[in-house]
């Protein structure tokens, strides 16, 4: 048997030593971890899982830390203060890495698509033409490499500084789009809104002239929300509209050659491979949307978002040419990037301007118009019908709510159409009261606006978000009239309390009826009623007037002061002034009931005999 060479023996010995050292370290680490509190152990393990092991190290057992020199890392972790999650530097690092990876992937995909779609000669010529003042010194490739060297923010600002003509050239637009993190997309859309005014050549057909109105109305962030809701086929068709529209340039002289490029790219995109690329990209976008969405955009209820998705898909599916809404692009971009801040079924007041209501009502109408033909054309009739069904209720509600002229027919809607619609929006602006009024399902507290008593009665009672009577804020329904009652309220002591409580004023309801007065546990609190002297603020503890079950069944009357004082007998002359002479005959009639009551009132009213006052004098 051949002897093992010397170098191999040395290698084996060194490996054994290393393994023994690693085992010893792991053992020490395990002991340390077992003595550590659970939260600290969890922190260490999470951090190790995030960082991952470098390839040269042997993988340690699951309960241990990294092999290699662990001491500096460990001390840093153990001394670290546990603050809010979004400030944790490990989590921030992880987020940055994820964003960088996503941006790289999307850049690669975008560049592949561009290479597949573009005709190099045309595109280079157009780019040279787009910025003649500045770009003479470099070829497109040099410019691209220089832009890649810049950080995304610098590149974006530099492009913004150059001006409108340059930035709507296709390649910078798309590369800027995909270099941004989703959070930056919104402010970009608002800043670009002024620069992106599409000038259309008079020679173009209305179909071509209407096409640019579509990409503006979906600011990038909203476009992502929409695409995450659409079925894959829908998003595929929408990509058609968007990628074409990204190629539009404001130069009216070049519209003819653009139409050629557009048709060519449409034809290519309809082929199978390109559609697969688009679908993959849509999938990636869906993954990226969910973490990247801004809370502002999700204020609407899910129903609202699906409605947006349905509306924009039906408008964007390859037939934006029929879409009659070329309103001012910049303003619409700003408005839509804020998100529609209204929900369909809640009773909150909508934050909408009249112009918003106009565009919204026009959008659903055009969406309804186009759902049928588009579904048939794209071969996805069922999906579109389902969307239309889900959309039906919100649409009808919207159209009833917004009293807006229906959009222009597609034939007239050229550039003149946009002017007319801007004028309509201007006319709509002065009376904001009609669209802003909330829908009927959430009525406020049921009182006429001019009735001060009822407004005082329902003070602090908020109308709930749904249909129904207002909720009461406390446990009891407190009657609180501060004005003097009308003269009809001065009644004889024999008048039952229910009649007192339901005295009608001159056409207005002054008191709640007997059904509205809530008696809880046998106690009724009427502040400032004819039964109680003194202000309710001072005596609110003493104003609980007690009933017994038998007395409630038989009568609603209270003993007069004179009878109670005769029974107690401390000062018989005091009640003569307040108690009227009319009280005497009634007392004689009702003696049996009063005897019943007096037995029960002896304990309760012995100390506070003067609280009950039947004269109703204010």
Curated annotation (Swiss-Prot):
It comes from the Eukaryota. It holds the Pfam family Phostensin. It is found in: Cytoplasm, Cytoskeleton. Keywords: Acetylation, Actin-binding, Cytoplasm, Cytoskeleton, Phosphoprotein. The modification Phosphoserine is found at residues 54, 131, 139, 181, 201, 231, 437, 535. The modification N6-acetyllysine is found at residue 462. Residues 585-594 have a biased composition (Acidic residues). Residues 96-109, 308-319, 485-505 have a biased composition (Low complexity). Residues 429-451, 572-583 have a biased composition (Pro residues). The modification Phosphothreonine is found at residue 205. GO terms for cellular component: cytoplasm; cytoskeleton. One of its GO terms (molecular function) is phosphatase binding. Residues 15-505, 556-594 are annotated as: Disordered. Residues 15-33, 110-160, 173-197, 234-245, 271-289, 348-358 have a biased composition (Basic and acidic residues). May target protein phosphatase 1 to F-actin cytoskeleton. PANTHER family: PHOSTENSIN (PTHR21685:SF0), TON-B BOX DOMAIN (PTHR21685). Interacts with Protein phosphatase 1 (PP1). This is Phostensin. It comes from Sus scrofa (Pig). The lineage of its organism: Eukaryota, Metazoa, Chordata, Craniata, Vertebrata.
